[in-house]
């Protein structure tokens, strides 16, 4: 029984050291205007990107995010096409990376700007994250 308790305590300690994902508590959502999407549609897309960042960008802090804009957004329609979707929305963000380098694919102690988030949906449904990066 003592071994089981010791094992459970050790497991609890290890789990407490595991990161909780990206930090989004102070993210600035920059104002945007669109003739293509409503404010609610854009906010829903931003929420999807923030949720993904929270889960997958351990050691990173999202500092700003916004809608790319109608004119540039249309250039990304191929993502909707290849994902059998009708709509695409592109967000742009900035985030800081701590000394850990996130998951190892990012430069430690750096800031990423103009980072794109590409989301698609079909016929006004829910946005789905399909890609991100430069």
How would you label these PLM feature ranges?
Residues 1-22:
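Sec-dependent N-terminal signal peptides of Gram-positive bacterial secreted proteins and lipoproteins
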Residues 3, 16, 90, 99-101, ...:
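Low-complexity, compositionally biased segments
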Residues 8-11, 28, 110, 118:
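Residue-level signal for the start and early helices of compact helical domains
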Residues 19-111:
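Flexible low-complexity loop/turn motifs enriched in small/helix-breaking residues
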Residues 112-134:
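Short beta-strand edge/turn micro-motifs at domain boundaries
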């Amino acid at each position: 029984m003592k071994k089981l308790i010791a094992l459970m305590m050790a497991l609890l300690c290890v789990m407490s050291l595991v990161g909780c994902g990206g930090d989004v508590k102070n993210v600035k959502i920059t104002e945007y205007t669109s003739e293509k999407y409503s404010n609610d549609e854009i906010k829903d897309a931003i929420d999807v990107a923030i949720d993904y960042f929270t889960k997958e960008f351990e050691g990173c802090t999202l500092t700003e995010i916004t809608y790319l804009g109608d004119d540039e957004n249309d250039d990304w329609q191929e993502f909707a096409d290849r994902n059998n979707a009708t709509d695409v929305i592109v967000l742009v963000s900035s985030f800081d990376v701590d000394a850990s380098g996130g998951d190892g694919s990012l430069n430690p102690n750096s800031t990423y700007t103009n980072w794109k988030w590409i989301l698609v949906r079909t016929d006004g449904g829910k946005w789905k994250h399909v890609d991100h990066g430069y």
